């Protein structure tokens, strides 16, 4: 039951309200209860097929969806459906856990699709589902020509897919997230029917405030020339801390470059994963140091803001002193973090100097 069963449900062990626990009284009888549920992210995706046959698309959907297809006697298509002792249809499970799918024809595109909801992206990531649908289609003489994401996806869905397809190619994964997502888009044909813009389809990009991001990345978004001119100007920031972080980031970038070159060097195919892992490490350190470029200047700005606080009354003096102390402490912690992070560059560049492509040792 729904509302009618509320008095009984409220007293059951483990079913009591998480908030607003109270007996079923006149007030609750009037207002009822609000149930709020949460689930993991659902990815809705359509796979484009080189056919107009809904029946063929359905066959592929039944092959892969977790529920599968009904078991039949004799002919697997026209035979009598098998029932169990309770009269329920016996199902032959599909190959993908946490997936629901059906085949249909789309008038707008003039093709058939396998339409899928991936309800558990931890068990069945998008790229795994894509490869399996491709396999099932090929087994039936068909081909997946592209993929259409319906709605939004978390960024990790595209990152995981891009890394997966790079590894299948035995190519380094130590590249920028933008490049990794581009590989995912091309590998799964996400732009087959219409342009695919991650800025419009990835959850994280849509919920972030671009103004906040721009303010947080003011320095690293500058050109090399602009950053140099800003440093040379009368403004006290950016100063040594930001420049040190940027120098460290460039050092990490060079080590990463050599790792990527080594990973794809002719004759070194057996070592691609070794260098890909080093490139991954270098890319991670570089990104941390790039973030510290702006964080160091932000820390200095906090000191300047504290210095500018009013100091007319004793209360204002106390507040100003406390703010200045906190800002000064933060302004010492950031350079320390920069030094510790910069130290993480050395294992990468040391390995590349001794093991990497000898043509790049000067880098």
PLM regions with names:
Residues 220, 224, 228, 232-243, ...:
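Disorder-to-helix initiation segments
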Residues 1-222, 226, 233, 319, ...:
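Long, contiguous binding/interaction regions
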Residues 264-310:
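A structural-propensity feature for long, helix-poor, extended segments
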Residues 41-43, 296-363:
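Amphipathic alpha-helical interface segments
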Residues 231-258, 359-363:
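Conserved phosphate/anionic-ligand binding catalytic regions in large, soluble enzymes, centered on
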Residues 1, 64, 133, 254, ...:
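Hydrophobic alpha-helical packing residues
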